């Protein structure tokens, strides 16, 4: 009997160990790559420092053949001379896993400015070769990431060379990058774009996909609200005539307002530049008040929030800070004609 009990206990323990192993295998099988960090180079434990004294190159593993899966590699190029720049030129043979919705989410190569953490660009796919990149100091960082699916070929190869900065005359405003333009000049340029994709591509031609992904990443902030207009009842012709007078006299109507002027903000740019709001407008020719002059004023005002893109210069850092923000605007819900001078109360 004792021997039988020991055999049963041993069998139960073995079953528990097997179940735990199966659960571990199952959880690893269904783990998703989306949980890994997406922006910037945040893997210093993987970083390989390369001292740059002459021209050279780095490349994805097995280049120009298919690179391995589940790989994270980070290189930091450091020039010995602190007064030089590092130029990166991508080999014409470039191919990584294709983007999803024009955004590099899975396999990509990314270049970062170590001095301020600015991501200069993220690239994937094979439709075009990334443009040349130049550091603003004597260091630059490169990061390569591949997930567990769909490795591609040939990968990438980046040739690096040293550049000696040469000082020239100050560039004209037309040749400056968008982030270096005066806000008033940039505001005029921003006004010409009809979609947010065109705007972000103009501001960040090499990293616009990454910025767009960050911009639309879900947050807990309050979303802008819409408002609804009720239909007017029309019974007979006289009522119709009277209603038309009411509609086109002192009533809430669409007005476009400049956000910078409305919010009295000269330190930032909003896109779109203008929004539609409801404001009282029209005349008071048929004012029912016994006075010589009537004016149209709001009798019910509400504040509504609208989600817009905000562009703000970074203090001491190159580039613009881009974020989705809610701006409060007044909307006139109801209006009335009152005697001029009696609008208070």
Swiss-Prot record:
One of its GO terms (molecular function) is growth factor activity. The record marks 225-226, 231-232, 234-235 as: Cleavage. Its main location: secreted. CDD domains: CUB, PDGF. InterPro entries: CUB_dom (IPR000859), Cystine-knot_cytokine (IPR029034), PDGF/VEGF_dom (IPR000072), Sperma_CUB_dom_sf (IPR035914). PROSITE patterns: CUB (PS01180), PDGF_2 (PS50278). It is found in: Secreted. Glycans are attached at residue 55. Keywords: Cleavage on pair of basic residues, Developmental protein, Disulfide bond, Glycoprotein, Growth factor, Mitogen, Secreted, Signal. Residues 46-163 form the CUB domain. GO terms for biological process: platelet-derived growth factor receptor signaling pathway; positive regulation of cell division; positive regulation of cell migration; positive regulation of cell population proliferation; positive regulation of ERK1 and ERK2 cascade; positive regulation of phosphatidylinositol 3-kinase/protein kinase B signal transduction. Disulfide bonds join 104-124, 250-294, 280-335, 287-337. Proteolytic removal of the N-terminal CUB domain releasing the core domain is necessary for unmasking the receptor-binding epitopes of the core domain. Cleavage after basic residues in the hinge region (region connecting the CUB and growth factor domains) gives rise to the receptor-binding form. Residues 1-22 form the signal peptide. GO terms for cellular component: extracellular space; membrane. Homodimer; disulfide-linked. Interacts with PDGFRA homodimers, and with heterodimers formed by PDGFRA and PDGFRB. Growth factor that plays an essential role in the regulation of embryonic development, cell proliferation, cell migration, survival and chemotaxis. Potent mitogen and chemoattractant for cells of mesenchymal origin. Required for normal skeleton formation during embryonic development. Required for normal skin morphogenesis during embryonic development. Plays an important role in wound healing, in angiogenesis and blood vessel development. Belongs to the PDGF/VEGF growth factor family. This is Platelet-derived growth factor C.
